Regions:
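Conserved ABC transporter NBD signature motif
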Residues: 63-74, 81
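Catalytic Walker B motif of ABC-type/P-loop ATPase nucleotide-binding domains
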Residues: 164-168
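Helix-to-loop junction immediately C-terminal to a conserved catalytic motif
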Residues: 55
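Conserved ABC ATPase "signature" region
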Residues: 117-135
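H-loop/switch region of ABC-family ATPase nucleotide-binding domains
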Residues: 196-197
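The feature captures the beta-strand-to-loop junction immediately N-terminal to the Walker
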Residues: 40-42
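Conserved ABC ATPase signature
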Residues: 139-143, 147
Length: 243
């Protein structure tokens, strides 16, 4: 039986102070190698908090978090997971710290212990794979929103993660950048959990779907455009519409 990269077992998560009601309760989740999970739900239901809990940035109030079967309890226990699980934040600017694209993308490999030459080669290779060849000398703050998002993804992928956590990756992207990101993720074998309100995007890049209902994580299925007859709340005459 294939061992999950990470798993959560009966996890409850709450914001401080301690008496606060849980944001999520009795969460059971595992991510297998090569698995692509799409996570959706209304704003404020705890999706981002769940990703932060996986990486130890928000600690569970109860339950067990495992990485390759090992229970994570102390801060130092999460180090190996954070090196192996890449987290792409909603706002790309939160992950871009250096003047040039090359410096940003090479930062992760350098932290993993690669030499400057190896980190540069890894960064250039990753930029090329994402269609960003020639970007290495560009100033990060002058990039478009879509370009910044791709560079932040490149910075994570340059670390060769076992899994990705993507928080609203299409947020603020124009149609061209969204399509480019969709094409990249659709062919990327790396295991991942993707949060998105963009249904079309989520169904193209995910193979399993989950949502959050009443503070609990549930398996779900994607919605598709359809037509049906029903009584409209502003009138009793049945009518047809396209979603």
């Amino acid at each position: 039986m294939t061992q999950p990269i990470f798993s959560l077992e009966n996890v409850s998560i709450a914001h401080e102070p301690a008496p606060a009601l849980p944001v999520l309760e009795e969460v059971n989740l595992s991510l297998l190698p090569g698995e692509h999970i799409g996570l959706y739900g209304p704003n404020g239901c705890g999706k981002t908090t769940l990703l932060r809990c996986i990486t130890g940035l928000h600690r569970a109030r109860r339950g067990i978090v495992r990485f390759h079967g090992q229970i994570l309890q102390r801060e130092e226990d999460y180090h190996a997971l954070r090196c192996a699980v890449g987290f792409v934040l909603q706002q790309a600017e939160d992950q871009l710290f250096f003047p040039t694209v090359l410096e940003d993308v090479a930062f992760g490999p350098l932290n993993l212990g690669l030499s400057p030459r190896e980190a540069r080669e890894r960064a250039l290779e990753t930029l090329t794979a994402l269609g960003l060849e020639g970007f290495e000398k560009r100033q990060t703050h002058r990039l478009s929103g879509g370009e910044k998002k791709l560079v932040s993804l490149a910075g994570v992928l340059a670390m060769r993660p076992e899994a990705l956590l993507l928080d609203e990756p299409t947020n603020t992207l124009d149609a061209a950048a969204r399509q480019r990101l969709t094409d990249i993720l659709a062919t990327l074998p790396t295991a991942r959990i993707t949060i998105s309100h963009d249904w079309d995007f989520l169904t193209r890049v995910s193979s399993r779907f989950m949502t959050i209902v009443d503070r609990r994580l549930c398996f779900s299925a994607p919605s598709f455009a359809h037509s049906h007859l029903h009584a409209h709340p502003h009138g009793n005459d049945p009518h047809q519409h396209d979603l």
